[in-house]
Amino acid sequence: MLKLYKFTDAKKEYWETWDNDDGSHTVHWGELGTTGQSKQVKGSLLKKPEKIIQKEVDEMVSNGFRPIEEEYTLLIEYKIEGMGTKEDVEKRHRLQDRMSETLGWAGLGHCDGGSIGSGTMEVCNYVVDFEVAKSVIEKDLKGTEFENYTRIYHEEAE
Protein backbone atom coordinates (compact mmCIF):
# COMPACT_ATOMS: atom_id res chain seq x y z
CA MET A 1 0.00 0.00 0.00
CA LEU A 2 1.19 3.48 -0.85
CA LYS A 3 -0.30 6.52 0.89
CA LEU A 4 0.36 10.11 -0.17
CA TYR A 5 -0.91 13.32 1.40
CA LYS A 6 -1.09 17.01 0.57
CA PHE A 7 -1.83 19.39 3.44
CA THR A 8 -2.37 23.08 2.71
CA ASP A 9 -4.05 25.82 4.72
CA ALA A 10 -7.14 25.41 2.54
CA LYS A 11 -7.43 21.62 2.33
CA LYS A 12 -6.01 18.29 3.50
CA GLU A 13 -6.07 15.56 0.86
CA TYR A 14 -5.04 11.91 0.59
CA TRP A 15 -4.31 9.54 -2.29
CA GLU A 16 -3.59 5.86 -1.80
CA THR A 17 -3.32 2.65 -3.75
CA TRP A 18 -3.06 -1.05 -2.99
CA ASP A 19 -2.84 -4.37 -4.83
CA ASN A 20 -5.88 -6.62 -5.00
CA ASP A 21 -5.83 -10.42 -5.09
CA ASP A 22 -6.95 -10.49 -8.74
CA GLY A 23 -3.95 -8.51 -10.05
CA SER A 24 -5.84 -5.22 -10.21
CA HIS A 25 -5.13 -2.21 -8.02
CA THR A 26 -7.47 0.05 -6.07
CA VAL A 27 -6.88 3.79 -6.09
CA HIS A 28 -8.64 5.76 -3.35
CA TRP A 29 -8.52 9.55 -2.91
CA GLY A 30 -10.33 12.46 -1.33
CA GLU A 31 -10.37 15.13 1.33
CA LEU A 32 -9.01 13.89 4.66
CA GLY A 33 -11.81 12.67 6.92
CA THR A 34 -14.19 11.80 4.05
CA THR A 35 -14.77 8.54 2.22
CA GLY A 36 -13.66 10.14 -1.04
CA GLN A 37 -13.70 8.21 -4.27
CA SER A 38 -12.11 5.00 -5.50
CA LYS A 39 -11.50 3.16 -8.73
CA GLN A 40 -10.12 -0.16 -9.89
CA VAL A 41 -7.12 -0.17 -12.22
CA LYS A 42 -6.69 -3.25 -14.39
CA GLY A 43 -3.96 -3.96 -16.85
CA SER A 44 -4.29 -4.79 -20.51
CA LEU A 45 -2.24 -6.84 -22.94
CA LEU A 46 -0.05 -3.82 -23.63
CA LYS A 47 0.06 -2.15 -20.22
CA LYS A 48 0.58 -3.60 -16.76
CA PRO A 49 -1.46 -2.03 -13.94
CA GLU A 50 1.79 -1.14 -12.14
CA LYS A 51 2.77 1.17 -15.02
CA ILE A 52 -0.62 2.89 -14.91
CA ILE A 53 -0.35 3.31 -11.13
CA GLN A 54 3.23 4.60 -11.35
CA LYS A 55 2.11 7.29 -13.79
CA GLU A 56 -0.56 8.40 -11.29
CA VAL A 57 1.98 8.35 -8.43
CA ASP A 58 4.33 10.54 -10.46
CA GLU A 59 1.47 12.98 -11.16
CA MET A 60 0.49 13.13 -7.49
CA VAL A 61 4.09 13.77 -6.39
CA SER A 62 4.47 16.51 -9.01
CA ASN A 63 1.28 18.07 -7.55
CA GLY A 64 2.80 18.19 -4.05
CA PHE A 65 1.59 14.90 -2.53
CA ARG A 66 4.09 13.21 -0.19
CA PRO A 67 4.21 10.31 2.25
CA ILE A 68 3.68 11.36 5.87
CA GLU A 69 6.34 10.23 8.29
CA GLU A 70 4.67 11.33 11.53
CA GLU A 71 1.61 9.54 12.79
CA TYR A 72 -0.21 10.21 16.05
CA THR A 73 -1.30 7.54 18.49
CA LEU A 74 -5.03 7.96 19.12
CA LEU A 75 -6.54 5.81 21.85
CA ILE A 76 -10.21 5.11 22.49
CA GLU A 77 -10.64 4.20 26.13
CA TYR A 78 -13.49 2.39 27.93
CA LYS A 79 -14.00 1.79 31.63
CA ILE A 80 -14.37 -1.91 32.47
CA GLU A 81 -14.54 -3.98 35.63
CA GLY A 82 -11.15 -5.35 36.68
CA MET A 83 -9.44 -7.29 33.91
CA GLY A 84 -12.56 -7.32 31.73
CA THR A 85 -14.84 -10.06 30.50
CA LYS A 86 -15.04 -12.22 27.40
CA GLU A 87 -17.73 -9.82 26.15
CA ASP A 88 -15.37 -6.85 26.65
CA VAL A 89 -12.70 -8.57 24.55
CA GLU A 90 -15.23 -9.38 21.82
CA LYS A 91 -16.44 -5.77 21.84
CA ARG A 92 -12.85 -4.55 21.54
CA HIS A 93 -12.29 -6.81 18.53
CA ARG A 94 -15.46 -5.49 16.86
CA LEU A 95 -14.32 -1.92 17.51
CA GLN A 96 -10.86 -2.65 16.10
CA ASP A 97 -12.46 -3.94 12.88
CA ARG A 98 -14.72 -0.89 12.72
CA MET A 99 -11.83 1.53 13.27
CA SER A 100 -9.75 -0.16 10.55
CA GLU A 101 -12.62 0.45 8.12
CA THR A 102 -13.58 3.92 9.35
CA LEU A 103 -10.06 5.34 9.49
CA GLY A 104 -8.87 3.58 6.36
CA TRP A 105 -11.71 4.74 4.11
CA ALA A 106 -11.39 8.31 5.46
CA GLY A 107 -7.68 8.42 4.58
CA LEU A 108 -6.80 8.93 8.24
CA GLY A 109 -4.86 5.84 9.27
CA HIS A 110 -5.43 2.41 10.76
CA CYS A 111 -6.18 0.47 13.92
CA ASP A 112 -3.22 -1.33 15.48
CA GLY A 113 -4.98 -3.47 18.07
CA GLY A 114 -5.82 -2.89 21.67
CA SER A 115 -5.33 -3.79 25.30
CA ILE A 116 -7.48 -4.66 28.26
CA GLY A 117 -7.01 -4.84 32.02
CA SER A 118 -6.73 -2.87 35.26
CA GLY A 119 -10.10 -1.21 34.83
CA THR A 120 -9.73 0.04 31.25
CA MET A 121 -9.90 -1.21 27.70
CA GLU A 122 -8.20 0.68 24.87
CA VAL A 123 -8.15 0.50 21.10
CA CYS A 124 -4.96 1.90 19.58
CA ASN A 125 -4.99 3.74 16.25
CA TYR A 126 -2.28 5.46 14.21
CA VAL A 127 -3.59 8.56 12.44
CA VAL A 128 -2.11 11.37 10.31
CA ASP A 129 -4.27 14.14 11.84
CA PHE A 130 -5.44 13.72 15.44
CA GLU A 131 -8.22 16.35 15.47
CA VAL A 132 -9.81 15.23 12.18
CA ALA A 133 -9.61 11.58 13.25
CA LYS A 134 -11.14 12.29 16.66
CA SER A 135 -14.05 14.13 15.04
CA VAL A 136 -14.66 11.33 12.52
CA ILE A 137 -14.53 8.68 15.27
CA GLU A 138 -16.92 10.59 17.54
CA LYS A 139 -19.46 10.82 14.70
CA ASP A 140 -18.94 7.19 13.70
CA LEU A 141 -19.47 5.82 17.21
CA LYS A 142 -22.53 7.94 18.07
CA GLY A 143 -25.63 5.77 18.41
CA THR A 144 -23.67 2.49 18.36
CA GLU A 145 -22.66 -0.03 21.01
CA PHE A 146 -19.32 1.81 21.13
CA GLU A 147 -20.58 5.29 22.10
CA ASN A 148 -19.95 4.74 25.82
CA TYR A 149 -16.19 5.38 25.62
CA THR A 150 -14.55 7.24 28.50
CA ARG A 151 -12.31 9.35 26.31
CA ILE A 152 -10.51 9.62 22.99
CA TYR A 153 -7.01 10.90 23.53
CA HIS A 154 -3.60 11.50 22.00
CA GLU A 155 -1.17 9.18 23.76
CA GLU A 156 1.90 11.37 23.28
CA ALA A 157 0.06 14.39 24.77
CA GLU A 158 -0.67 12.57 28.04
Question: What residues fall within each predicted segment?
Answer:
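Short glycine-/aliphatic-rich beta-strand segments at the starts of folded cytosolic domains
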Residues: 70-87
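A short, exposed loop/beta-hairpin motif centered on an aromatic-Gly-Thr core
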Residues: 34-48, 121-126
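Short, hydrophobic/aromatic-rich segments at coil-to-beta transitions
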Residues: 1-6
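Short aromatic-glycine-(Arg/Gly/Cys) micro-motifs in beta-strand/loop hairpins
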Residues: 13-40, 97-117
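Conserved short beta-strand edge segments in small beta-sheet-based binding/regulatory domains
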Residues: 66-67, 143-158
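Short, intrinsically disordered low-complexity segments
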Residues: 106-135
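A short, charged, amphipathic alpha-helix used as a generic interaction element across diverse proteins
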Residues: 44-61, 134-141
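Charged, amphipathic alpha-helical regulatory modules used
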Residues: 91-96, 112, 155-157
